[in-house]
A protein has these predicted regions:
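A eukaryote-biased signal for short, well-structured alpha-helical docking elements
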Residues: 33-34
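Generic preference for hydrophobic/aromatic residues in regular secondary structure cores
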Residues: 12, 49-51, 119-121
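HotDog/MaoC-like acyl-thioester-processing domains
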Residues: 64-65, 76-139
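Generic structural detector for well-ordered beta-strands
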Residues: 9-13, 58, 104
């Protein structure tokens, strides 16, 4: 399979803000994981997916009330039982990401034990190959 980009957009409302009047990091993290889960669930049954680690969730600028938080996610690495998803957030028509990072999910059976998923990733774009290299170096 080739990486496929999934889009997940959210309107930043007053209840999403922190004491500085910008998007609360906790809300950002929640949406970040949801965006990653959507990509993972495109390849595996949702009931079999568990999040095991968020890697390097990095913010580069604040997000203001009324802005549209546009998340993009895609599977960028597969292991025997795991898959790693790259997620980035861009604010409406901004080119540079406001937030980016990786999430590792594991495929589990009905007892919650890791089980092989059989997924194989085919990387063709320069960006995907670069992101895959970064994902290989995650702890």
């Amino acid at each position: 399979m080739q990486p496929r980009i999934f889009h997940y957009d959210r309107l930043v409302k007053s209840e999403d803000l922190n004491h500085h009047g910008t998007l609360f990091a906790g809300r950002s993290a929640e949406w970040f994981v949801e965006a990653g889960f959507i990509a993972a669930a495109s390849a595996l049954p949702a009931k079999n997916i568990v999040c095991v680690k968020i890697h390097g969730l990095t913010f580069t600028q604040p997000v203001e009330a009324g802005e549209i938080a546009c998340f993009e996610s895609k599977i960028i690495k597969t292991g025997k039982t795991s898959l790693t998803v790259y997620v980035r957030l861009r604010v409406q028509e901004e080119e540079a990401p406001t937030l980016e990072g990786f999430i590792t999910f594991v495929n589990v059976d009905e007892l919650g034990r890791a089980q092989p998923h059989g997924l194989k990733l085919v990387l063709t774009s320069e960006e995907d190959i670069k992101l895959h290299q970064i994902a290989l170096e995650l702890d």
